[in-house]
C-alpha cells in the first residue's frame, strides 16, 4: 500500500484527504456513524419514503445537538457503562438486522442505540451531555405515538372540507360530503392513509428538534411555533388532496401518472418537504428577532442618531 502511494503524483496526493488517526474520539464517531447508517438502512428497507426521510432528519437533529461538543469529546467510559453499552449496542445491531415493516421496535432502537453510545463515551453520571440528542431521537417513538393518538375520522373530514375550501377559492365547483370531495367529473375520498396525520406529526416533531437545537427564548414565539406546526402540516396535505381532486376531475384518475405522483409516496414526500420548509422559514424568522443586532448595524444606528 505504501509503495502504491509513493507512485501517486504529489499534486494528486495533496488532494487526497488524510485519514484521521485512530483516536478514541474518532473511533467513537465512526461507531456512531455506523449505527446511524445501519438504522437508516433498516428504515429505507422496511418503511415508506416519508418515514425514512423523517428518520434521517431526526438523526441529523441529534448530530446538530452534539456538534458543539465534538471538539471536547473524549470517550472515557467506566467498566459498568462499557459493559452495559456494549451489550445494548450489540442487541440493537442484531435487532435492527431482523426488522420487518410492521415492527414498531424500529422507532425505539435509535434511542436505545444512542443510550448505548453515550455509555461507551461517558461515565453513567456524565451521559447528561447527550440529553438533547437523546430527546431528538425520542421524537421517533413520539412520532409513532402521535400518529396513533390523532383520530383518523375527524381528521379525514376536516381534510376533505379544507381541500374543498381551496378548490372553492380557485373557482372550482365542488361539494364536500363527509370525507369525499366531489367535483362535476369525479372526486376523491380522504381515507385514513391520506388524511395527513403523518405530515402533522412530522412537523410537530421537527418543531421540538428545532427548539432543542436552536432554542427560542420568548414564550410567545414558542407558543406560535407549536401552534402553527400542526396547521402547516394539515394545510400542506389539504392542498395535495385538492390537486388530486383536480386530477380526477380532468380525467387523470387512479392509475394515471399524474394521480400516482401526487397520491403515492413521491408526491406526498414533496408536500412533506414543503411543509418542513415553510415551518423552517417561520422558525428562523422568529429566531432572528431574538438575535442581537450585528455590530455594524449598531454602529450605523448610532451614527444616524448623532
Residue ranges of model-derived segments:
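Hydrophobic N-terminal alpha-helices or hydrophobic patches in metabolic proteins across all domains
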Residues: 1-306
Amino acid at each position: 500500500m505504501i509503495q502504491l502511494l509513493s507512485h501517486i503524483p504529489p499534486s494528486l496526493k495533496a488532494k487526497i484527504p488524510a485519514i484521521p488517526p485512530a483516536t478514541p474520539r474518532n473511533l467513537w464517531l465512526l461507531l456512531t456513524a455506523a449505527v446511524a447508517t445501519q438504522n437508516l438502512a433498516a428504515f429505507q428497507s422496511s418503511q415508506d419514503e416519508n418515514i425514512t426521510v423523517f428518520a434521517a432528519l431526526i438523526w441529523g437533529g441529534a448530530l446538530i445537538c452534539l456538534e458543539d461538543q465534538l471538539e471536547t469529546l473524549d470517550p472515557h467510559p467506566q467498566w459498568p457503562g462499557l459493559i452495559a453499552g456494549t451489550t445494548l449496542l450489540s442487541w440493537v445491531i442484531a435487532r435492527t438486522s431482523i426488522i420487518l415493516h410492521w415492527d414498531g421496535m424500529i422507532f425505539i432502537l435509535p434511542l436505545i442505540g444512542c443510550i448505548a453510545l453515550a455509555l461507551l463515551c461517558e461515565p453513567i453520571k456524565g451521559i447528561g451531555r447527550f440529553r438533547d440528542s437523546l430527546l431528538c431521537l425520542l421524537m421517533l417513538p413520539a412520532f409513532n405515538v402521535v400518529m396513533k393518538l390523532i383520530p383518523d375520522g375527524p381528521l379525514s373530514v376536516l381534510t376533505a372540507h379544507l381541500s374543498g375550501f381551496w378548490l372553492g377559492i380557485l373557482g372550482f365547483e365542488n361539494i364536500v360530503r363527509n370525507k369525499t370531495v366531489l367535483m362535476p367529473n369525479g372526486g376523491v375520498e380522504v381515507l385514513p392513509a391520506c388524511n395527513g396525520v403523518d405530515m402533522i406529526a412530522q412537523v410537530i416533531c421537527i418543531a421540538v428538534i428545532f427548539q432543542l437545537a436552536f432554542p427560542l427564548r420568548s414564550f410567545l414565539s414558542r407558543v406560535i411555533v407549536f401552534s402553527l406546526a400542526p396547521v402547516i402540516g394539515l394545510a400542506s396535505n389539504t392542498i395535495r388532496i385538492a390537486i388530486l381532486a383536480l386530477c380526477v376531475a380532468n380525467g387523470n384518475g387512479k392509475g394515471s401518472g399524474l394521480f400516482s405522483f401526487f397520491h403515492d409516496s413521491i408526491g406526498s414526500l414533496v408536500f412533506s418537504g414543503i411543509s418542513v420548509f415553510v415551518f423552517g422559514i417561520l422558525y428562523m424568522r422568529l429566531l432572528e428577532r431574538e438575535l442581537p443586532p450585528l455590530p455594524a448595524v449598531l454602529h450605523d444606528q448610532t451614527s444616524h442618531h448623532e
